[in-house]
Curated annotation (Swiss-Prot):
Protein's gene: MVD1
Biological processes annotated in GO: ergosterol biosynthetic process; isopentenyl diphosphate biosynthetic process, mevalonate pathway
UniProt subunit comment: Homodimer.
Cellular component terms (Gene Ontology): cytosol
Reaction catalysed by this enzyme: (R)-5-diphosphomevalonate + ATP = isopentenyl diphosphate + ADP + phosphate + CO2
Name the record gives this protein: Diphosphomevalonate decarboxylase
Length: 388
């Protein structure tokens, strides 16, 4: 039996200008444009291997060792679009194998908790789409491929690029102009770092999709956000990235996180993603910036309580020094020589704050999807390792 295989990795991205709200649920078209930073795959990534064979009678997906249902409309939409593009190639070249007619086996693994507010669906769908596009030898560029990833998970389209990325909401009803574009590559501003404080490993109470629908349907503040606040902030944030102006970038990032959680709170019933630990971390970062007399650290929170703190390499000792002072008992500091940190800060915070954080992930801006020589699939097109 002939088995065609391909593997790719894709990164997590963390939005600094938030995507929240759909204008078309089936196509995953957003109500506003968004911006994100792609994080290093050394710390957070999804690896996906795909196989196609004439002998595979159906599509199958294994996620983190377990066979999962492929009945999700989102996944089916991605596979259908990829097959359509492959069919176009096959119709123009009769010598290439008819992979579009074969079943595909998809094996995917994350190196971080799934559905814990760490953008697992973004990396997952990005890796899925890129690995199959690679298998199918599709000629489309990453912006074009991002439109397919978007149908799987809106924020997945931003994981198609490294560095600093914008998802342009577009205007077309068919979504043809709703795609990800590079604002600046990793090499433009390589000293951006991020500390992720994992506040909860649990699945969140209100999934993003249902939360968005509630906000769009019930929040008056949301309309103000998408019409007045985000369009200007989108331009200003892109400009701050191009100028490598951290103070402006950080200010806009924190304001947009707060704006996003404000519209969640303004929804009926209100949606609470931040917990007490999250709020104390927010206060800690504001105290740090106040002490420094300028913004050297910026928090952002997605649809969950986990904090992502952005800072520049040159301020690492000060920023991580304050975080280490209160979270030294939490795992995740192993990759850093903590003796280099400035822990002399007189900033006061709850000494029990560390109890609300399960681990810390120290990472930085990173590259986009990469082809991988590592494969999760054996020569029969089945997972090399399957959970019991």
């Amino acid at each position: 039996m002939t088995v065609y295989t391909s593997s790719a990795t894709a990164p997590v991205n963390i939005a600094t200008l938030k995507y929240w709200g759909k204008r078309d649920k089936s196509l995953n078209l957003p109500t506003n444009s968004s911006i994100s930073v792609t994080l290093s795959q050394n710390d957070l990534r999804t690896l996906t291997s795909v196989a196609a064979s004439e002998d595979f009678k159906e599509d199958k997906l294994w996620l983190n060792g377990k066979l999962e249902s492929l009945e999700s409309e989102r996944t089916k939409a991605c596979l259908a679009d990829l097959r359509t593009l492959r069919k176009e190639l096959e119709s123009n070249d009769s010598s290439i194998p008819k992979l579009s007619q074969f079943g595909v086996h998809i094996v995917s693994e994350n190196n971080f908790p799934t559905a814990a507010g760490l953008a697992s669906s973004a990396a997952g769908f990005a890796a899925l789409v890129v690995s199959i596009a690679k298998l199918y030898e599709l000629p489309q560029n990453m912006s074009e491929i991002s439109k397919i990833a978007r149908k799987g998970s809106g924020s997945a389209c931003r994981s198609l690029f490294g560095g600093y990325v914008a998802w342009e909401m577009g205007q077309e009803t068919n979504g043809e102009d709703s795609k990800a574009v590079e604002v600046a590559p990793l090499s433009h501003w390589p000293n951006m770092k991020a500390a992720i404080l994992v506040v909860s490993d649990d699945k969140k109470d209100t999934p993003s999709t249902s939360g968005m629908q509630t906000t769009v349907a019930t929040s008056d503040l949301f309309q103000w956000r998408i019409k007045e606040v985000v369009p200007k902030r989108f331009d200003d944030m892109k400009d701050s990235i191009l100028r490598k102006d951290f103070a402006t970038f950080g200010d806009l990032t924190m304001k947009d996180s707060n704006s996003f959680h404000a519209v969640c709170l303004d929804s009926t019933p209100p949606i609470f993603y931040l917990n007490d630990t999250s709020k104390k971390i927010i206060k800690l970062i504001h105290e740090l910036n106040k002490r420094e007399g300028k913004i050297i650290a910026a928090y952002t929170f997605d649809a969950g309580p986990n904090a992502v703190i952005y800072y520049e390499q040159e301020n690492e000792s000060k920023v991580l020094g304050v975080i280490y002072k209160y979270f030294s008992k939490v795992s995740g500091w192993e990759k850093l020589d903590t003796k280099t940190l400035d822990t002399t800060s007189d900033i006061q915070a709850d000494p029990e704050l560390y109890k609300g954080v399960s681990k810390i992930i120290l990472t930085e801006v990173g590259q986009g999807p990469q082809g991988s020589s590592e494969s999760l699939i054996n020569d029969k097109g089945l997972p090399k390792a399957v959970a019991n």
